[in-house]
Protein backbone atom coordinates (compact mmCIF):
# COMPACT_ATOMS: atom_id res chain seq x y z
CA UNK A 1 0.00 0.00 0.00
CA UNK A 2 1.13 3.50 -0.69
CA UNK A 3 -0.24 6.99 -0.29
CA UNK A 4 -1.20 8.89 -3.44
CA UNK A 5 -1.63 12.61 -4.02
CA UNK A 6 -4.32 14.47 -5.95
CA UNK A 7 -2.19 14.59 -9.10
CA UNK A 8 -1.92 10.79 -9.13
CA UNK A 9 -5.67 10.37 -8.58
CA UNK A 10 -6.39 12.83 -11.40
CA UNK A 11 -4.05 10.81 -13.64
CA UNK A 12 -5.87 7.58 -12.70
CA UNK A 13 -9.24 9.17 -13.52
CA UNK A 14 -7.97 10.54 -16.83
CA UNK A 15 -6.48 7.20 -17.89
CA UNK A 16 -9.40 5.02 -16.77
CA UNK A 17 -12.13 3.95 -19.18
CA UNK A 18 -15.53 5.59 -18.71
CA UNK A 19 -17.82 3.73 -16.35
CA UNK A 20 -19.45 3.75 -12.94
CA UNK A 21 -16.20 3.10 -11.04
CA UNK A 22 -14.44 5.97 -12.81
CA UNK A 23 -17.40 8.21 -12.00
CA UNK A 24 -17.28 7.03 -8.38
CA UNK A 25 -13.52 7.67 -8.20
CA UNK A 26 -14.02 11.14 -9.67
CA UNK A 27 -16.66 11.92 -7.02
CA UNK A 28 -14.37 10.64 -4.24
CA UNK A 29 -11.54 12.79 -5.59
CA UNK A 30 -13.79 15.87 -5.70
CA UNK A 31 -14.88 15.29 -2.10
CA UNK A 32 -11.29 14.83 -0.93
CA UNK A 33 -10.16 17.94 -2.78
CA UNK A 34 -13.07 20.04 -1.49
CA UNK A 35 -12.46 18.98 2.13
CA UNK A 36 -8.69 19.52 1.71
CA UNK A 37 -8.05 15.94 2.84
CA UNK A 38 -5.19 15.28 0.42
CA UNK A 39 -2.79 17.13 2.71
CA UNK A 40 -3.69 15.44 6.00
CA UNK A 41 -5.18 12.11 4.85
CA UNK A 42 -4.07 11.13 1.36
CA UNK A 43 -5.84 8.10 -0.10
CA UNK A 44 -4.11 4.76 0.22
CA UNK A 45 -3.63 2.79 -2.97
CA UNK A 46 -3.32 -0.93 -3.50
CA UNK A 47 -1.10 -2.02 -6.38
CA UNK A 48 -0.92 -5.18 -8.44
CA UNK A 49 2.34 -5.56 -10.37
CA UNK A 50 3.13 -1.88 -9.82
CA UNK A 51 -0.25 -0.68 -11.12
CA UNK A 52 -2.73 1.08 -8.82
CA UNK A 53 -5.93 -0.98 -8.88
CA UNK A 54 -7.85 0.17 -5.79
CA UNK A 55 -8.01 3.21 -3.49
CA UNK A 56 -9.30 3.82 0.04
CA UNK A 57 -10.30 7.31 1.11
CA UNK A 58 -10.29 7.55 4.93
CA UNK A 59 -9.37 9.96 7.68
CA UNK A 60 -7.91 9.35 11.12
CA UNK A 61 -8.42 11.43 14.24
CA UNK A 62 -6.64 11.76 17.58
CA UNK A 63 -9.42 9.94 19.43
CA UNK A 64 -8.55 6.60 17.82
CA UNK A 65 -11.25 6.77 15.15
CA UNK A 66 -10.96 6.15 11.43
CA UNK A 67 -13.70 7.50 9.18
CA UNK A 68 -13.99 5.42 6.03
CA UNK A 69 -15.45 7.36 3.12
CA UNK A 70 -14.83 5.34 -0.02
CA UNK A 71 -13.23 2.18 -1.34
CA UNK A 72 -13.06 2.13 -5.11
CA UNK A 73 -11.61 -0.37 -7.55
CA UNK A 74 -10.48 1.16 -10.81
CA UNK A 75 -12.70 0.63 -13.84
CA UNK A 76 -11.96 -2.66 -15.55
CA UNK A 77 -10.19 -4.10 -12.51
CA UNK A 78 -13.35 -5.31 -10.73
CA UNK A 79 -13.86 -8.94 -9.76
CA UNK A 80 -10.24 -9.66 -8.88
CA UNK A 81 -10.54 -9.23 -5.12
CA UNK A 82 -8.56 -6.00 -5.14
CA UNK A 83 -10.96 -4.16 -2.82
CA UNK A 84 -10.72 -6.98 -0.29
CA UNK A 85 -6.92 -7.03 -0.49
CA UNK A 86 -6.85 -3.25 -0.16
CA UNK A 87 -9.20 -3.45 2.85
CA UNK A 88 -7.01 -6.11 4.51
CA UNK A 89 -3.92 -3.95 4.12
CA UNK A 90 -5.73 -0.82 5.26
CA UNK A 91 -7.18 -2.28 8.48
CA UNK A 92 -3.77 -3.66 9.44
CA UNK A 93 -2.22 -0.22 8.80
CA UNK A 94 -5.04 1.61 10.61
CA UNK A 95 -4.83 -0.49 13.76
CA UNK A 96 -1.11 -1.23 13.95
CA UNK A 97 0.39 2.01 12.66
CA UNK A 98 -2.28 4.63 13.35
CA UNK A 99 -3.50 3.08 16.62
CA UNK A 100 -7.08 3.15 15.40
CA UNK A 101 -9.55 1.62 17.83
CA UNK A 102 -12.90 2.34 16.15
CA UNK A 103 -14.34 2.75 12.67
CA UNK A 104 -17.09 5.08 11.52
CA UNK A 105 -18.64 4.22 8.20
CA UNK A 106 -21.72 4.90 6.13
CA UNK A 107 -22.50 2.62 3.20
CA UNK A 108 -25.16 2.22 0.57
CA UNK A 109 -27.37 -0.87 0.64
CA UNK A 110 -25.71 -2.14 -2.55
CA UNK A 111 -22.37 -2.50 -0.74
CA UNK A 112 -23.67 -4.13 2.45
CA UNK A 113 -22.83 -7.68 1.37
CA UNK A 114 -19.21 -6.71 0.72
CA UNK A 115 -18.92 -5.01 4.12
CA UNK A 116 -20.67 -7.94 5.80
CA UNK A 117 -18.07 -10.35 4.36
CA UNK A 118 -15.46 -8.17 6.03
CA UNK A 119 -17.06 -8.44 9.46
CA UNK A 120 -18.71 -5.04 9.72
CA UNK A 121 -21.99 -4.43 11.50
CA UNK A 122 -24.36 -1.51 11.10
CA UNK A 123 -26.49 0.25 13.69
CA UNK A 124 -28.59 2.84 11.92
CA UNK A 125 -30.20 3.72 8.60
CA UNK A 126 -30.25 7.35 7.51
CA UNK A 127 -33.09 8.99 5.55
CA UNK A 128 -31.38 8.21 2.22
CA UNK A 129 -31.18 4.50 3.05
CA UNK A 130 -27.46 4.42 3.81
CA UNK A 131 -26.38 2.25 6.71
CA UNK A 132 -24.24 3.75 9.48
CA UNK A 133 -21.85 2.19 11.93
CA UNK A 134 -19.50 3.01 14.77
CA UNK A 135 -17.63 -0.11 15.83
CA UNK A 136 -14.30 -1.50 16.98
CA UNK A 137 -11.71 -2.05 14.26
CA UNK A 138 -9.37 -5.03 14.32
CA UNK A 139 -6.13 -5.58 12.35
CA UNK A 140 -7.37 -8.60 10.42
CA UNK A 141 -10.51 -9.77 8.67
CA UNK A 142 -10.53 -12.93 10.83
CA UNK A 143 -10.62 -10.85 14.02
CA UNK A 144 -13.29 -8.58 12.53
CA UNK A 145 -15.42 -11.61 11.61
CA UNK A 146 -14.97 -13.09 15.09
CA UNK A 147 -16.09 -9.82 16.62
CA UNK A 148 -19.18 -9.75 14.40
CA UNK A 149 -20.08 -13.32 15.41
CA UNK A 150 -19.86 -12.29 19.07
CA UNK A 151 -21.95 -9.17 18.36
CA UNK A 152 -24.67 -11.19 16.66
CA UNK A 153 -24.80 -13.58 19.62
CA UNK A 154 -24.90 -10.78 22.17
CA UNK A 155 -25.67 -7.39 20.58
CA UNK A 156 -25.24 -5.52 23.87
CA UNK A 157 -21.50 -6.28 23.79
CA UNK A 158 -21.23 -4.44 20.49
CA UNK A 159 -23.34 -1.35 21.06
CA UNK A 160 -21.58 1.80 19.92
CA UNK A 161 -20.54 4.23 22.67
CA UNK A 162 -23.40 6.26 24.12
CA UNK A 163 -22.09 9.37 22.34
CA UNK A 164 -22.44 7.62 18.96
CA UNK A 165 -25.90 6.26 19.86
CA UNK A 166 -27.00 9.75 20.90
CA UNK A 167 -25.70 11.15 17.61
CA UNK A 168 -27.62 8.51 15.63
CA UNK A 169 -30.78 9.46 17.56
CA UNK A 170 -30.23 13.22 17.16
CA UNK A 171 -29.92 12.74 13.41
CA UNK A 172 -33.26 10.93 13.39
CA UNK A 173 -31.73 7.64 12.32
CA UNK A 174 -33.68 4.44 12.71
Ranges and model annotations:
Residues 1-14:
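A short beta-loop-alpha structural element at the N-terminal edge
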Residues 79-93:
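Conserved acetyl-CoA-binding loop-helix of GNAT-fold acetyltransferases
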Residues 51-59, 67-72:
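Conserved beta-strand in the GNAT
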Residues 99, 108-132:
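Conserved active-site alpha-helix within GNAT-family acetyltransferase domains
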Residues 40-45, 55, 70, 104:
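Short hydrophobic/aromatic beta-strand element in the GNAT-like acyltransferase core
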Residues 74, 78, 108:
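Residue-level recognition of the GNAT/N-acetyltransferase active site
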Residues 20-43, 57:
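Active-site rim helix/loop that mediates acceptor-substrate recognition in acyltransferases
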Amino acid sequence: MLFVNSTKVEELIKNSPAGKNTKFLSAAHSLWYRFKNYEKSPPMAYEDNGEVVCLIFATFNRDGYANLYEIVTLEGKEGNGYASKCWDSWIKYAVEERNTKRLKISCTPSSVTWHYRNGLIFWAVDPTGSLRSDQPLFPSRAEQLSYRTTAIGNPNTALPPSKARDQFKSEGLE
